[in-house]
Design a protein with these regions (language model features):
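Mid-domain alpha/beta scaffold segments of enzyme catalytic cores
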Residues: 1-224
Length: 224
């Protein structure tokens, strides 16, 4: 079963996220697990308009590969990356690719919750969005759950300890991202925050991820 919804190192049971050139290498090398492909907001700082267009074309092409099960990570970062306009252009283009191929969009959000939620409304997005590394508080988590169906919140090594309990159980995911901790230890920390039975978060998050991807017609259990 897939349990780790976001990492940067291919592994069985994990979705590794990378830029187009990285994902192309993983596919060629037969790396394990499944993949998401996208233009990280940090990368937009170094991209000319022509380079951004070329990268978006690569994302669109790779998005149709069977082992690429999601788009991103894409999003907004107020602390790092290109201009607001360039980040927005890259994000909206990737959100539209996700809609076109019917695969989830993985979000990178730093100090910009409002812009992401406004984009969800404006696009009338139909595919799920996975908010990777969610560090918002319980009030923000509850607002997202209440007002924005289709958004899943994923918790990594660092998170607001009150937030997981505010997430609808069916929308909770876990990830390693760049942490050295294994996914079961991260899930155990979320267990403690939720006051749940040890091991239950990992099982819940795995079932949620399988259902999320299966609902989009992608079945990573068929991947290596």
């Amino acid at each position: 079963m897939f349990t780790d919804c976001h990492t940067h190192t291919p592994a069985p049971g994990a979705i590794a996220s990378g830029a187009p050139e990285q994902v192309r290498r993983w596919l060629a090398d037969g790396a394990p697990g499944a993949f998401s492909v996208g233009i990280h907001p940090w990368a937009t700082a170094a991209l000319s308009p022509q380079a951004l267009a070329a990268q978006l074309s690569d994302v669109e092409m790779l998005a149709r590969c069977e082992r690429v099960v999601a788009i991103g990570e894409a999003g907004f970062d107020r602390l790092r990356g290109g201009s607001r306009a360039v980040q927005r252009e890259a994000f909206l283009a990737q959100a539209k690719i996700a809609e076109a191929v019917g695969k989830p969009l993985v979000l990178h959000v730093v100090k910009d919750i409002d812009d992401v939620l406004a984009a969800r409304r404006g696009l009338r997005a139909g595919v799920p969005w996975i908010w990777h590394g969610f560090r918002g508080n319980a009030l923000q988590a509850a607002q997202i759950m209440r007002s924005y169906p289709g958004i899943y919140l994923s918790f990594g090594e660092k998170f607001n300890k009150a937030a997981p309990a505010a997430v609808v159980p069916g929308c909770l995911l876990v990830e390693t991202d760049e942490s050295a901790l294994p996914i079961d230890e991260i899930a155990a920390r979320v267990d403690a925050s939720r006051g749940s039975i040890p091991g239950s978060t990992l099982s819940l998050a795995g079932a949620n991820l399988q259902r999320l991807l299966g609902g989009c017609g992608v079945f990573p259990e068929q991947s290596r």
